[in-house]
């Protein structure tokens, strides 16, 4: 039998096995409420939360985008690992505070917090719209990554479009049957699989390269720009490096499927362990494994074989391992993608249903009606993102970094200033956030970088300045909940 078909069989078998786990878990559950369906009743323990945090943060980007970035730009991309220390600290300090407030005041989203803190429905809707837009872009790209992985490892046994349909169908089943509790359980399994898979992929790449020392020696001789900043393409300038440390960590932490983990945590211990899991997993994946894979691509694969940098890992696996090992590694890549897809699909549907459609009715409809609407929205979000994925951009790395993360980072000023500064006003937060988003999209559409600084930096800091200045100058009284926060 064709090895491509066998490889596809391994992947489908994996997807079915995860579905069996979901069905078994779903049968044990009592009647679901919105809180249970979206946040697992705020009861995820200190074993499952770190694993679901790893799975949520490590998408198909770890297997496709990251090796592609190292292949294209070299070691400068390691700044991603360095910047994630900030994300871990945010989880510990900001995440625990919002967890306590959410337990006390019933928040299910960032929008709930902003509405309560500033007494502003506009901020809630704005936060929901920004979060949904950015997350759905990211979600569509996860479908792209999964489909590419299936298509490449199966040697074309399944078409790209068919692979999209498979990814959409299985993600719908996982989420609709399991809800947040099922997603967390699958995340725990898939986190272990993806970590083992990426290490195995690095080993496959290192063996024909002659080991770590020989790999770096050959790269230094053939493409020394890969081992220094700003990299082979000149991307990692001082200004871009600053963005990676300032804006990107906020954007990653404020991804709704990551931020919501704080609301799922059972206690402070669970949250602390999940914070520790972030740098450990980031170093293992991005500091070592994908670095070796990306650099090995320059030594082992001719440029003519690499149509897109995102495909360097699948190419290496097919070329330097047998079909079964390649299938297992790509199954791990798909595990990374499915775990993120599930979390993003769940949280996007939560934001659309609870913060937008049921904006004024959430407390006035029955639990059955709420769940019916929520499940319809899950289906609709998956369908829309699947359609987007059918005609994707050539590479999804820049879409993720330049739109999704930097757009979500604009939510940081109203959130953090509102939490730690009592004088922060509704008007200041509203104007700052609106201006930040407008500048981000305006500069991107126009393709301009004033004074050489990218638009997302202008948007982020003008957002902060406007929020602070208007709050200081305005005569608007404190929101009644300011003291609480």
What do these predicted regions represent?
Residues 1-485:
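Membrane-embedded helix-loop-helix hairpins and adjacent transmembrane boundary segments
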């Amino acid at each position: 039998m064709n090895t491509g078909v066998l490889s596809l069989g391994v992947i489908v078998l994996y997807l079915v096995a995860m579905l069996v786990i979901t069905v078994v878990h779903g049968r044990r559950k009592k009647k679901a409420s919105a809180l249970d369906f979206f946040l697992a009743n705020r009861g995820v323990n200190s074993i499952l939360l770190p694993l679901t945090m790893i799975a949520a943060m490590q998408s198909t980007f770890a297997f496709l985008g990251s090796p592609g970035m190292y292949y294209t730009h070299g070691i400068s991309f390691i700044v991603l690992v360095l910047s994630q220390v900030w994300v871990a600290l945010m989880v510990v300090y900001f995440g625990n505070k919002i967890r306590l407030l959410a337990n006390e005041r019933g928040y299910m989203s960032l929008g709930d917090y902003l509405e309560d803190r500033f007494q502003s429905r506009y901020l809630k809707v704005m936060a929901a719209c920004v979060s949904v837009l950015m997350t759905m872009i990211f979600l569509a790209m996860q479908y792209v990554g999964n489909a590419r992985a299936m298509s490449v490892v199966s040697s074309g046994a399944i078409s790209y479009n068919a692979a999209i349909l498979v990814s959409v169908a299985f993600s719908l089943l996982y989420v609709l049957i399991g809800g947040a509790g099922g997603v967390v359980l699958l995340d725990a399994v898939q986190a272990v699989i993806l970590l083992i898979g990426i290490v195995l992929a690095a080993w496959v790449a290192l063996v024909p390269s002659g080991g770590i020392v020989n790999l770096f020696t050959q790269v230094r001789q053939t493409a020394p720009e890969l081992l220094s900043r700003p990299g082979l393409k000149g991307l990692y300038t001082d200004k871009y490096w600053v963005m990676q440390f300032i804006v990107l960590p906020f954007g990653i932490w404020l991804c709704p499927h990551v931020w919501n983990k704080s609301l799922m945590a059972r206690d402070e211990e669970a949250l602390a362990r999940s914070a520790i899991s972030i740098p450990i997993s980031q170093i293992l994946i991005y500091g070592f494994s994908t670095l070796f894979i990306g650099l090995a691509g320059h030594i082992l694969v001719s440029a003519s074989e690499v149509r897109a940098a995102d495909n360097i890992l699948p190419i290496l696996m097919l070329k330097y391992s047998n079909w079964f090992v390649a299938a297992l590694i790509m199954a791990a890549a798909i595990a990374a993608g499915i775990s993120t897809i599930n979390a993003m699909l769940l949280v996007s549907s939560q934001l659309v249903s609870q913060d937008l459609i049921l904006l004024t009715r959430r407390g006035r409809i029955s639990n059955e009606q709420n769940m019916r609407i929520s499940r319809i929205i899950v289906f609709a979000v998956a369908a829309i993102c699947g359609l987007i994925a059918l005609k994707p951009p050539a590479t999804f790395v820049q879409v993720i970094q330049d739109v999704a993360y930097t757009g979500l980072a604009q939510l940081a000023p109203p959130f953090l200033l509102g939490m730690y500064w009592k004088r922060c006003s509704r008007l200041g937060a509203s104007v700052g956030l609106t201006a930040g988003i407008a500048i981000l999209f305006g500069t991107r559409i126009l393709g301009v970088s004033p004074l050489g600084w990218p638009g997302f930096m202008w948007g982020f800091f003008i957002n902060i300045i406007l929020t602070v200045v208007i709050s200081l100058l305005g005569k608007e009284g404190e929101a009644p909940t300011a003291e609480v926060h």
